[in-house]
Structures are given as C-alpha cells and as structure tokens.
Amino acid sequence: MRRCEVNSKPISEYFGIPCENREMAKCLLTSSLSVRTKLLQTGVSLYNTSHGFHEEEVKKILEQFPGGSIDLLKKQNGIGILTLNNPNKMNAFSGVMMLQLLERVIELENWTEGKGLIIHGAKNTFCSGSDLNAVKALSTPESGVALSMFMQNTLTRFMRLPLISVALVQGWAMGGGAELTTACDFRLMTEESVIRFVHKEMGIVPSWGGTSRLVEIIGSRQALKVLSGTLKLDSKEALNIGLTDEVLQPSDETTALEQAQEWLEKFVSGPPQVIRGLKKSVCSARELYIEEALQNERDVLETLWGGPANLEAIAKKGKHTK
C-alpha cells in the first residue's frame, strides 16, 4: 500500500497511518486542521466528555471551597482590569475563584469593545497558587487530572482572548500564580516581585498548561532550568531570560496599576476591531499550520479591508505618518 503525500510530506507524519489515495489524505488533514481552527474560535471549550472531562461535576466540587473573588472592571477605554482578590491567603485560588475565573473569561470573550486586559492581585501580591484546602480535598489522581483539565481549559481560553493581556506582578507569583502569568501576552514586574514555579517542591509538575507556555516564552533550555531548579526569579533575572517585558519603578498598588495601564495603552490604541484582529492573527500563527494560519489571516483581513478604520486611515494617508 503506497503512502499519500500532502505538501510533500507522508500523511503518516500527521496521523501515523497509511492511506489509499491523495484525496483521503487531504480530507483527513483538512479535518484535523478544522478541529484546531474551531478550538481557536472564541467561546469554544478545550475539552468535553469525549476526553473524559465532565465539567459540571468538577464545578460541583470546586464550589464547595469558598473564599476570595475574581473581580472585573471594564473601562470605557477598552482596557479591562481583572483582580485576584483573596489577600488573606496571598490571593491563592479557592475553588470558587477558579469557577469565577472561567466566568470572567466568558464575559471577556463577549466584550466586543474590549482591546486590552491587565490582571493583578490585591494588596501588592499577585497569586500564591491554589488554596491548599481545595488541593487536599482533591487527593486522588483522577480528581487532580480533572482539576488540571478545568484550569487548562480556562487558561487556554484566557490566552486566546482577542485582547492584548498583561500580567502585573507585584510581590509573589508562585505555583499556579506563576502559570497564570504565562497565559498573558506580556508580563510587567515591580522591582521587588518574584516569580517562582514551586511545583517540584510539591511533588508534581505544572498542570495548568504552564510548561508549554513557559517553553514558548523562554525556550526549552531555560524552562527546564526554571522548573527543575524551582528558581526564585526576581525582576532582574526574569527580564534577563525574557520572562518579563519591563520592570516598573517602586510604587504602591495604585501607582503600579496606573503604570501598567500607561504601558499597555500604546499597544491598544486604535479601533477595537483592528486590535482584536491582530491578536487573533497572532494566536492562529502560533497554534496552526502555516496554510491554516494564512487562511485565518485572510478571514480577519476581509472583516477590516474597506471598513471605517481602513478608509479613515487611507483618507489621512496614515500609512506614511510617522
């Protein structure tokens, strides 16, 4: 039985199976790409029952662990402020907070006027990971995997939001808090802040998608150092390895948030549909094969070409404005 080729590659490289003809190979490859493209669409869950994931059952367990809140402020300038609010426990995620984070992500997916998002922790601390009360109750491998799938789904949808996102790290970002920073497009740290992946000391590995995202940000070699060494990454070291984008001057909580907004504003200036289109294009370029990413680029362009922002820019000859 001969092997079919798509784009000069044996189809077995994609699926590990031989096929009878070129058309079948193309069909299989197209179906696989279509699935990934659908997952990139706003509002689509990463897992379902076919993966052994029962979301409602996980939610019933998580709602038994109250404490803290995830607060969202949507500003008129198109920048949202997401606050992890559980200061008595260094903003650790309770079960209810995990549920609320998904709710806020869904709300942001439907915020058509949104352009940017800043996530930070209350009282000058970012997040210390998971509340141990919830962790102790989820002691079996099955429950651990279920929680992992829930948070992987939430943070992947967070990462794919059509908003340019920034993690403002003050104080400590540990464990799950460190993983959360990697779901943002950018990271800003105050001078005294520290990011630390403490998972090895807890006898586990990152389980909220943090490993994949960390490798994407700083490369596999540096990621292995950070994870296996449980390194305490202060702002200087995080900047040196490319984990953070800028270090803010010493300031209180309010001033740091103002600085973060000022930093973000230069990236989100312009019409929402253009900023959102740019973010969608970057997401597809990162996660899809080149052919499908190019198709997505054309799809986004079709919604913008000849639109109000495009016509106004042409009228002002904005393309050549310095």
Curated annotation (Swiss-Prot):
This is Ethylmalonyl-CoA decarboxylase. Its EC number is 4.1.1.94. InterPro entries: ClpP/crotonase-like_dom_sf (IPR029045), Enoyl-CoA_hyd/isom_CS (IPR018376), Enoyl-CoA_hydra/iso (IPR001753). CDD domains: crotonase-like. The lineage of its organism: Eukaryota, Metazoa, Chordata, Craniata, Vertebrata. Belongs to the enoyl-CoA hydratase/isomerase family. It is found in: Cytoplasm, Cytosol. Decarboxylates ethylmalonyl-CoA, a potentially toxic metabolite, to form butyryl-CoA, suggesting it might be involved in metabolite proofreading. Acts preferentially on (S)-ethylmalonyl-CoA but also has some activity on the (R)-isomer. Also has methylmalonyl-CoA decarboxylase activity at lower level. The keyword Coiled coil does not apply. Keywords: Acetylation, Cytoplasm, Lyase. GO terms for molecular function: carboxy-lyase activity; methyl/ethyl malonyl-CoA decarboxylase activity. The modification N6-succinyllysine is found at residues 232, 316. One of its GO terms (cellular component) is cytosol. It catalyses: (2S)-ethylmalonyl-CoA + H(+) = butanoyl-CoA + CO2; (S)-methylmalonyl-CoA + H(+) = propanoyl-CoA + CO2; (2R)-ethylmalonyl-CoA + H(+) = butanoyl-CoA + CO2. It comes from Mus musculus. It holds the Pfam family ECH_1. The modification N6-acetyllysine is found at residue 232. Its main location: cytoplasm.
